[in-house]
Regions:
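Distinct, well-ordered alpha-helical segments
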Residues: 110-114, 171-184
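N-terminal hydrophobic targeting/anchoring segments and the immediately downstream early-domain regions
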Residues: 1-144, 149, 198-337
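Feature for exported/extracytoplasmic and membrane-associated proteins, marking the mature portion
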Residues: 115, 156-159, 164, 210
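Gly/Ser/Thr-rich loop/hinge elements
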Residues: 195
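Catalytic beta/alpha-barrel core
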Residues: 78-79, 163-170
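Ligand/cofactor pocket segment of small-molecule handling proteins
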Residues: 191
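Alpha-helix-loop-beta-strand connector modules within alpha/beta enzyme cores
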Residues: 68-72, 143-161, 178-188, 306
Length: 337
């Protein structure tokens, strides 16, 4: 197989990136990232519109602004509310976009807001964002009390309305309890194997297996500090894929790059919220000696090369195309409505 063969496989694939963070700011330069993603051959991306520190009012305003932008640029982008919207956008040469919320605090303990956010285009939501909230335990906490009563209600309501439950950033016990009560596939849209790198944001093999048993997908993230010594190379991304595919099969692996277009601005905003100011703990062995500008993130342009690396490692065309996005489309077909 040649690089040309890999390019053909990539061009014909439905390429999905399930996590583009930092889209809630008003900086117009961020939209250049969307154009880069579209130009790189990606078919679908899910953009973060709010995090656990946002209020419901802030979240709705952000969603309104992003929806207006998509309407004004409908020749390039389309709001994806169904799996068919993704397929249609691929045929039209447009980038399909859905929204995500990283954490459930923006609900402000109102279960009815899940359906409201769904109608505004939110297609997956994290239960927590590193810290405890009213739903469950965060992945950065020393202890995890599991899902509370409201947390169980949230999982069931998300299943009902057709919103993917995203367990990234969530504590172990809360994740496993969510798997027990869910009636639809659950996923980790941007999480890497703990077995490969000891980092509080990474997930254990038992969590990967539980995700696969639910019918879900683990999205490999391209954050260098979550893969090794600040290494965001394409080969390192494929190493994450190899581990997950070897454990549960390639049908349960996807991509959630979590690419940050402006490291310095992102980390300044992140650390401006005291409860979430945990950046030095992202990888204690490495990040203490790095400035935010030095944090490595895999870029959308690396995805074509990822297809080539997977081909060299023996993945067949079907597996490559499913990992690049077909597996996420399968989950969307089953959940989104």
């Amino acid at each position: 197989m040649t690089a040309s063969d890999a390019a053909d496989v990539y061009r014909s694939a439905i390429v999905c990136d399930m996590l583009l963070p930092y889209m809630y700011g008003a900086d117009p330069a961020k939209y250049l990232t969307l154009e880069r993603i579209r130009a790189s051959g990606v078919s679908f991306v899910s953009i973060t519109t709010a995090v656990d520190w946002h209020t419901l009012e802030e979240t709705v305003h952000i969603l309104a602004r992003e929806r207006a932008y998509l309407r004004a640029h409908s020749d390039q982008y389309v709001l994806a509310e169904s799996a068919e919207d993704i397929m249609s956008a691929k045929r039209d040469g447009r980038l399909a976009i859905a929204f995500n919320v990283q954490g459930t605090n923006p609900l402000q303990s109102d279960l009815g807001m899940i359906e409201v956010l769904h109608r505004l285009g939110v297609r997956h939501m994290l239960l927590t964002y590193n810290q405890h909230n009213t739903v469950g335990g965060g992945g950065y906490e020393a202890s995890d009390g599991g899902l509370g009563k409201f947390g169980r209600m949230v999982v069931r309501e998300m299943n009902r309305v057709g919103m993917l439950v995203d367990l990234s950033h969530t504590g172990h016990r809360s994740c496993m309890e969510a798997f027990e009560i869910a009636s639809a596939p659950l996923s980790f849209t941007h999480s890497n194997p703990l077995a490969l790198w000891d980092n509080p944001r990474n997930i254990g093999d038992d969590m990967i297996r539980a995700c696969a048993q639910s019918g879900g997908v683990v999205g490999v993230t391209g954050i260098g500090l979550h893969m090794g010594d600040n290494d965001a190379s394409t080969e390192m991304i494929c190493r994450q894929i190899d581990h997950i595919a070897g454990l549960v099969g390639p049908e349960h692996v996807g991509i959630g790059l979590s690419y940050v277009h402006d490291n310095v601005a992102f980390m300044a905003d992140f650390n401006g919220h005291a409860a979430w100011a945990v950046a030095p703990d992202l990888a204690p062995r490495v990040s203490q000696s790095l400035s935010p500008a030095e944090y490595a993130f895999a870029t959308p342009e690396q995805l074509l090369g990822l297809a080539e690396v997977m081909m060299r490692r023996g993945y067949d065309t079907e597996a490559i195309q499913n990992i690049l996005g077909g597996n996420w489309v399968r989950v969307a077909r089953r959940i989104w409505r």
